[in-house]
Amino acid sequence: MTTETPLPVLELLPAVDVVNGQAVRLVQGEAGSETSYGTPLEAALNWQEQGAEWVHLVDLDAAFGRGSNAELLREVVGRLDIKVELSGGLRDDESLEKALDLGVARVNLGTAALENPEWTARAIDRFGDKIAVGLDVRGTTLAGRGWTKEGGDLWDVLARLEEAGCARYVVTDVTKDGTLQGPNVELLRKMVERTGKPVVASGGISSLEDLKVLRSLVPLGVEGAIVGKALYAGAFTLPEALDVAGRR
């Protein structure tokens, strides 16, 4: 009798998006569509207590260029015992070094990778796998600063980042983010076909079934999934999600 080999684990990264000192969720990344969920520290500690191994922490004020929650984020990272991926407003050496000095496992570069490819290549060269690049996509067009500007063709930018030696990509379909409409599996399949680097999926995850589908893509190169609104809205619990994703 043959036994099926279990699928590898899909890493889950519960999201904590921060606006004006509060943990919030946005719909399709639009300012003004926030729903507040208490303090970022409470949210992050809650995910840690429920078994998360990662938290995806985003300073949305910094991402939109309207301020910073740096001191608050420092407290959150300092209190957590699990790994943190930090995103939002990392556009120059100073902001990048400050973020890494917090002790996060990795940072996620977004707009900077589109607007300043030379700097991004240098950052990748300096910090290696501590750098992930966030590719926020509408169709195959990249969205830039806070998702409000266009940033070029996905495949052109990916080719450039591959040449620079980027270690990991965080891929968000911005038309699905915060909508609970399901992830863009076709986009993820195309991404892993074009890179040998791990891909983290973001946007649209609405059900445990969605997580099963994403876990089936792990052998192809989808390493993890950022989960936000579905957790906050109670579509499923984090322990349920971790069971589906495969606990270590």
Swiss-Prot record:
Gene3D superfamilies attached to this UniProt entry: Aldolase class I
GO cellular component: cytoplasm
Pfam family, one: His_biosynth
Chief location: cytoplasm
Amino-acid biosynthesis found in the keyword field: yes
Compartments it resides in: Cytoplasm
Pathway: Amino-acid biosynthesis; L-histidine biosynthesis; L-histidine from 5-phospho-alpha-D-ribose 1-diphosphate: step 4/9
Secretion signal span: none
InterPro entries: Aldolase_TIM, His_biosynth, HisA/PriA_Actinobacteria, Isoase_HisA-like, Isoase_HisA-like_bact, RibuloseP-bd_barrel
EC class name: isomerase
Active site feature: 17, 136
Coiled coil (UniProt feature): none
Gene Ontology molecular function terms on file: 1-(5-phosphoribosyl)-5-[(5-phosphoribosylamino)methylideneamino]imidazole-4-carboxamide isomerase activity; phosphoribosylanthranilate isomerase activity
Keyword annotations from UniProtKB, A to Z: Amino-acid biosynthesis, Cytoplasm, Histidine biosynthesis, Isomerase
SUPFAM superfamilies in the cross-refs: Ribulose-phoshate binding barrel
GO biological process: L-histidine biosynthetic process; L-tryptophan biosynthetic process
Superkingdom: Bacteria
Annotated catalysed reactions: 1-(5-phospho-beta-D-ribosyl)-5-[(5-phospho-beta-D-ribosylamino)methylideneamino]imidazole-4-carboxamide = 5-[(5-phospho-1-deoxy-D-ribulos-1-ylimino)methylamino]-1-(5-phospho-beta-D-ribosyl)imidazole-4-carboxamide
Family as reported in the entry's similarity comment: Belongs to the HisA/HisF family.
Identification of the protein by name: 1-(5-phosphoribosyl)-5-[(5-phosphoribosylamino)methylideneamino] imidazole-4-carboxamide isomerase
UniProt organism field: Arthrobacter sp. (strain FB24)
